[in-house]
Amino acid sequence: MNDDKTERPVKTANQRGAARLAAVQALYQMDVGGTGVLEIVAEYEAHRLGQEIDGATYLKADAGWFRSIVSGVVRDQVRLDPLIAVALQDDWALSRLDSTVRAILRAGVFELLDRKDVPVAVIVTEYVEIARAFFDDDEPKLVNAVLDRIAKQVRGEAKK
């Protein structure tokens, strides 16, 4: 019997998924705590991505992907928020959304606009799954609907 546990390398797709989740958490932290982008990126890269915290191990994440999402959302927020606001139902303002949902939508819309190399279906599915990690109710459906509407608008395609 061999007790050697060989660690399988984490697939790039999994590292990107972990980077997306970490980016949403960082954007949330920035929104509620007022932390700056440089500080939050440095904190996550040094102390969270792939690290153990309070007995839980963060997944190994693609640090470049994480940085790209967080800094891109901050840089492009004035472009992202109006797109999200238009895609929301008429009586919903972006400010009424839960901070986590706002972070998920901003990150997802950023990728739809900036990462044309990533299929719409991958982006929408990943961010809906992140929403499911935080919410049981209607929020994942909202994330799906808003990202799908914006994908049709900016890429001319919906999730397939």
Swiss-Prot record:
GO terms for molecular function: RNA binding. GO terms for cellular component: cytosol. Keywords: RNA-binding, Transcription, Transcription antitermination, Transcription regulation. GO terms for biological process: DNA-templated transcription termination; transcription antitermination. Signal peptide: none annotated. InterPro entries: NusB-like_sf, NusB_fam, NusB_RsmB_TIM44. SUPFAM superfamilies: NusB-like (SSF48013). Belongs to the NusB family. Involved in transcription antitermination. Required for transcription of ribosomal RNA (rRNA) genes. Binds specifically to the boxA antiterminator sequence of the ribosomal RNA (rrn) operons. This is Transcription antitermination protein NusB.
